Amino acid sequence: VQPVERTYFHQVQDVFEGFVIDVAGTLHSTAHGRGLKVWYDDSTREHYEAQLIRVDGAVVLEIGFHAEYPKVAENDAVLGRLLGEEQVWRGELGDEPEAGVFIGVDRWRRISEVWDEPDPDDVDVAIEIAARLADYVSVLEPLRRA
């Protein structure tokens, strides 16, 4: 996967942070050439990302929530709690999110969706990415903390 221009995901980060100002907890975020990672408080193993990944040889953008503990059982427990509230988050996020095994790492879990690779010159798409990631955070973070 070729990194997108470094400043692109920094643009996403700047816009994203404005969208989630009312979400409880201490926001941490890091932008890099292939994406943006966001977590609250000390919860680095349970986080949100907008990141470029490769699927069947194509570069795509994955947006959503990840549980990335070393043990499958821990990740399954996190996903299970969120699936117990699926009616709530589906009502807000729609049919696009897929819940299950992480793309490329079988032991991790996700609630996320895949978009076409973004054009790094398209500021409007950067705003859309930030808004969609903020949707995930705004809906899932209160459920994750419950």
Model-derived segments and spans:
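Polyanion-binding interface signature
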Residues: Q2-R109
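Charged, low-complexity intrinsically disordered regions
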Residues: W89-A146
